Amino acid sequence: MKKIFLEYLNELIYMLKEYENSWWAEWMEKAYIKYRDENDIDKFLRAFGGMGSFSDSIFKNDCTDLIKTITSNMGYEINKNGYTDVYEILDRIVKYDISWIKECTENNRDISYYQENEKRLAFFSYLLENYVPGNLHEINTAYLEQSQNKSR
């Protein structure tokens, strides 16, 4: 599972460099090295605490935030349990988004309440269906291209 967390963290770093022009990329690179070399998750988790933290970041590319969501969940599970399962995390997020969309539609809420969740659900479902260890960058890139083509 260490390899999978590092793959997701590496993809997050790529997204930060490629789409966000964010100084957080450097922080995450240091966290990557710290975890890879020393199994120390603390540098990564410290990015999420307090005002102005990585949690508060607003990204230009929606997929950056979605990869951040998965990676942060993995980091917290590693810290708590010593391991993580990306498929369980994706499944949990998909179930949450489905229940939120269902609740919104049953209560006749405006589409704006759940429109973002529909996008999240599409991305997380795509990962759940297509991800195998080692192919994250490839399928994320394909998803980004597909999304950009739809918006044109």
PLM feature spans:
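Residue-level recognition of alpha-helical structural elements
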Residues: 1, 5, 17, 24, ...
